[in-house]
Amino acid sequence: MDGTDMTEQPVYKRVLLKVSGEALMGSREYGLDKAMVQTIASDIADVVAFGVEVCLVIGGGNIFRGVSAAASGMDRAQGDYIGMLATVMNALAMQAALEKLNVPTRVQSAIPMASVCEPYVRRRAQRHMEKGRVVIFAAGTGNPFFTTDTAAALRAAEMGCNVLLKGTQVDGVYAADPRKNPDAERYNELTYLDVLSRDLSVMDAAAISLCRENHLPIIVFNIHETGAFGRVIRGEGRFTRIVETQ
């Protein structure tokens, strides 16, 4: 843990943190950066220690992307299933990092693999969280053609989370990729319709629509910034908030 100041009351009681697979790469071009995984785990541990119930959805883009494979000629459904298995690998790596910090963690997969992790069972996941355990949801929704962002929106709604936090490699939502266009406009707050009408690259339309229908706010922040997760939980730091109305 990094000693983040968590003396102020958290704004949220139960949250879902979506971590992209790419965020786990750190400065690498492929796979997992162990130091980055441990840093993110440390931030999660600080938030859990403050009494916040946390669940996660982790992407698999650092290992395999079904959409990219489909563009290269692979059957899309087959590619998506491979991508789902990649998320299980990432989930197990994050579980190991959290348990190294003595944070009790369970992995639940939408694709049953009993010898590796628990199957996804909604009520069991809720009980885990009530007992202070972190739950990592793996294998997306278990269905091809759905992104892990949509899986995050679905699980957040099922778990009754107060907010969906998307940890990315930049500190919010921009009109264009700020790493390619330093002058890109940054937004502090947007509505769901803003994101959809402007075709902003935050989440896919299905994920945004699911959050909108369930009145689930979305917060986008830089997960590579040490302690950022804890600051967002307290309503501090730099982030973009996506809500029904501004």
Curated annotation (Swiss-Prot):
Inhibited by UTP. Its EC number is 2.7.4.22. It comes from the Bacteria. It catalyses: UMP + ATP = UDP + ADP. It is an enzyme of class 2 (transferase). NCBIfam families: pyrH_bact. Belongs to the UMP kinase family. This is Uridylate kinase. It comes from Granulibacter bethesdensis (strain ATCC BAA-1260 / CGDNIH1).
